[in-house]
């Protein structure tokens, strides 16, 4: 075993599907077997213990999803950015993870309460440490990404998720050793797929089928391990098709399957159940390229459907929004006014969105 990699896990003593906050939970309320969940978790634990040191955080009653430690936060070096959970059903986990990191001497950063960010579930480091892939669209806000750049001194590449089945980045995207990337392209918008193609050469990209995607093949743990003086690249996952296993084998990876079907009922698998707490910092500080603008709208915003068209335009263009002010006219014939903060992953996307918004009648606020 090697001490180079440390992974945080949480025993599933209180795990169950108690509510619905993603599509996988629908129809599975209280249909998970605690006994099988314990057995599958321990099998994963034993597999990973072969390749890494496993740290544990104590499970807490009332917080069944605490077992998914990938969402505790994002760790680089001795710094952690704690999660701000989108759903109230998970927000009670935050202080327990905060105490765990503080007790071990990490520098802990916390985002504003109004800014959701779900840790390493939505932020995955390129395995060479060159940049951080960060997801947004369902659980994490794009406006959280500049904080990651500032606090962690890392280049952040923002990817927009568009398939609600793949609500976290780590459910459909897995950076691997030596620049390889395992991912499900249909989970991303066009801009994000173009960005992936620009950063990852074609020979390094491993797009997977929907069949493998719904088995959470991308929700995998990749560990490099030295065995008898020989380097071994291990990918631990719930399940992979024969074709995918062959593709990975041809690229020098050893696939280790371990069933995690009880956790799929809650929308998670191997990666969701783990958090790597030994991620090295990149060497050079980076600046954020994420853009923000404020626009002003005035008119019969609701009756005309203008406000909905504006917000839809922002999202369809690859951006995100926050309504800062909305003043509704007192009478039906009165006009309404709104201020909306628009965020985009880079200047080109912002320029395209702003052009469309101005065509709709929006005014850019200096």
Residue ranges with predicted function:
Residues 1-285:
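The feature marks the mature, well-folded catalytic cores of soluble enzymes
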């Amino acid at each position: 075993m090697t001490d180079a990699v440390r992974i945080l896990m949480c025993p599933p003593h209180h795990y169950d599907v108690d509510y619905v906050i993603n599509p996988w939970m629908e129809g599975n309320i209280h249909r998970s077997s605690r006994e099988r969940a314990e057995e599958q978790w321990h099998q994963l634990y034993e597999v990973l213990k072969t390749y890494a040191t496993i740290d544990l955080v104590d499970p807490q009653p009332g917080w069944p999803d605490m077992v998914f430690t990938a969402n505790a936060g994002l760790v680089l070096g001795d710094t952690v950015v704690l999660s701000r959970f989108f759903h109230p059903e998970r927000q009670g986990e935050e202080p327990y993870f905060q105490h765990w990191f503080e007790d071990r001497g990490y520098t802990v950063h916390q985002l504003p309460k109004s800014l959701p960010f779900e840790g390493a579930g939505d932020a995955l480091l390129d395995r060479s440490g060159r940049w951080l892939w960060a997801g947004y669209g369902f659980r994490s806000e794009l406006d959280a990404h500049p904080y990651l750049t500032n606090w962690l001194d890392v280049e952040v590449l923002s990817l927009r998720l568009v398939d609600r089945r793949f609500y976290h980045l780590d459910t459909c995207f897995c950076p691997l050793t030596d620049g390889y990337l395992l991912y499900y392209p249909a989970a991303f918008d066009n801009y994000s797929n173009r960005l992936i193609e620009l950063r990852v050469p074609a020979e390094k990209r491993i797009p997977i089928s929907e069949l493998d995607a719904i088995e959470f093949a991308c929700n995998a743990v990749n560990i490099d391990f030295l065995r008898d003086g020989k380097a071994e690249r291990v990918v631990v996952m719930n399940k992979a098709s024969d074709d995918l296993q062959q593709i990975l084998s041809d690229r020098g990876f050893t696939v280790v399957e371990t069933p995690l079907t009880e956790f799929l009922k809650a929308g998670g698998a191997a990666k969701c159940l783990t958090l790597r707490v030994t991620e090295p910092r990149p060497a050079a500080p980076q600046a954020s390229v994420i853009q923000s603008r404020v626009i002003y709208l005035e008119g019969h915003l609701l009756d005309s459907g203008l406000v909905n068209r504006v917000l839809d335009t922002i999202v369809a263009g690859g951006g995100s929004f926050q309504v800062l002010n909305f003043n509704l006219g007192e009478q039906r014939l009165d006009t309404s006014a709104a201020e909306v903060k628009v965020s985009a992953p880079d200047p080109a996307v912002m320029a395209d969105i702003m052009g469309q918004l101005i065509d709709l009648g929006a005014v850019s606020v200096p």
